[in-house]
Amino acid sequence: MSAKEFPTTDYSKITQKYYFEYVAKRIIKIAKLQNTNKTILDFGCGQKIFSRLLKNYEIINYDIKPEYTEFESYENLHFDIVIFNHVLMYLYPSEIEKLLDKIKKLNPNCEMVLGISRQNIINRIAMILSFNPLAHKGIRSTYKEQVEIFFKKTKLIEKKSNILAMTDIFYSRFCS
């Protein structure tokens, strides 16, 4: 699957805008991002929702799609917090492990926020009702795989489950 084929949230569509802005606002609240002077890496930034919601904060936007990214690579950047919002599901489990290892090597003290699709029947119904049948095209890892890998490498700071029964949010940092 090429970079162009991965789905991107379209904030011009009212159902996607409402839901994903709500998830982004919950991420901001859980990780207390509205009160930070830390540099935030929005990994898989898409249409840069966090830059819009957190004006006047230092947000680094990185995406596999050239039209969205501000940097060719995240590997030479300095950041304190990484947001993975509905992103890891497009990586194979081995790629998630490698990514987290790279992030830890770059900053072993960074915090991470994971917004993760529960990939359940409610998500599928929402895809249909929002006229977005390709929303989960290209998924390479299950909810369970993502959570297992994430918590093998990190420890939980805070969790918010069940955002409309479709998304879980985990705020964590690397294990020692």
Where are the predicted features?
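A short glycine-rich, Lys/Arg-flanked "PGG" loop and its adjoining helix->strand segment in the class I
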Residues: 97-110
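Class I (Rossmann-like) S-adenosyl-L-methionine-dependent methyltransferase catalytic domain
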Residues: 1-39, 43-74, 91, 113-176
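Short N-terminal helix/helix-N-cap motif within the alpha/beta-hydrolase-1
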Residues: 92-96
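Short catalytic micro-motifs in class I SAM-dependent methyltransferases
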Residues: 86-90
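A conserved beta-strand element that flanks and buttresses the S-adenosyl-L-methionine
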Residues: 83
